[in-house]
Amino acid sequence: MEYTTLIARLKTASKSFVNLEMQLADPDIANNPKKLELIAKERAKLEPLVLDFNQLLDTDKEIDDSRQLLKDNRNDKDMELLINEELCNLEVLKNSLIQKVTIALLPKDPRDERSVMLEIRAGAGGNEACIWAGDLARMYERYGQKIGWSVKPISASESDMGGFKELVISIKGDSVYSQLKFEAGVHRVQRVPATESQGRVHTSTATVAVMPEADPVEVKIDPSDLEIGTARSGGAGGQNVNKVETAIDLIHKPTGIRVFCTQERSQLQNRERAMEILRAKLYEIQLKEANDKERSQRLMQVGTGDRSEKIRTYNFKDNRTTDHRLGSNFALEPILAGQLDEVIDACIAQEQKRIMEDFNENEN
């Protein structure tokens, strides 16, 4: 992006920021909580960009002043050396700020700010795959709790040997999808299962789907397309067994999608949760169809996000996690403890690089 074009876009963003601040000071808006919250969010999103823009303008002025000072001190070698050193530092800062604001101005995925439904399914590997699915669920739970998101299982099919055949987790918070969308795909584990008497390393897999939550307005569901049954929720026996049919078994006939929801205490709550999951699944189908139409012949470097794509291998023997999209290795234990920031940040940087390259190609 040419520098003059960049500055023009930053000036537009700065004007929008000033306008939002004026709206926040408007008594009428102050008395409208929903509108106030919306405007405050928009202002918060723009503030870092505007601060960086102001710093860029200040740096430009310092560079101009230093160049003038250099002209005025041509005969003073010591002063010339100091000014050139300062100019070098200012140019480095300017280039860093240009890269930062350019990335901030790149087109954003409109779904990035949404909460998600995260679905984990045991893949190849039998009981060990189910146990691995449970390990992944705990990893995401720890990551979400560390950030301050609300993490809640809303549908689960447990395995007799531990873990889950399938699990759907609701993760609510700010910009959840922007972080977790890179987790979609096949997660492979290489380790010696607890049930392995010979000490042999087994390879198992689990599939992760990350579905941005959809509003009812975005996904229309015809009630006649639904087949809804009820069942008793499973329990640990004794007083914990649910004698009332609170579980919901929901089938969307056109797609064959089935959702079995048992986690809530009442049938109504389970039905609401089942509909949330169904909407997210149907929304994911809509997005995939739209992306397939728009996608160019070249696959995204960060990965297609396809749930059949192997994205990561967790090797317990070598205490190593390999992200195949990045071609990078990470320590295993911190990753499983929910410390995913390093790998997710690297995926974000890779995606931003790709978007910037595409943007520059289109500009040319």
Swiss-Prot record:
Q: What is any Pfam family matched here? A: RF-1
The modified positions for N5-methylglutamine read Q239
- Keywords for the protein's UniProt record, in alphabetical order: Cytoplasm, Methylation, Protein biosynthesis
Q: Name one GO cellular component term.
A: cytoplasm
Provide any one GO MF term from the record. translation release factor activity, codon specific
UniProt PTM: Methylated by PrmC. Methylation increases the termination efficiency of RF1.
Q: Which residues form a coiled coil?
A: none
The record's listing under SUPFAM superfamilies reads: Release factor
Q: Where in the cell is it found?
A: Cytoplasm
Q: Which PANTHER family match?
A: LD18447P (PTHR43804), PEPTIDE CHAIN RELEASE FACTOR APG3, CHLOROPLASTIC (PTHR43804:SF8)
Family stated for the protein in its record: Belongs to the prokaryotic/mitochondrial release factor family.
* The protein, known as: Peptide chain release factor 1
Taxonomic source organism: Prochlorococcus marinus (strain MIT 9515)
Gene symbol here is: prfA
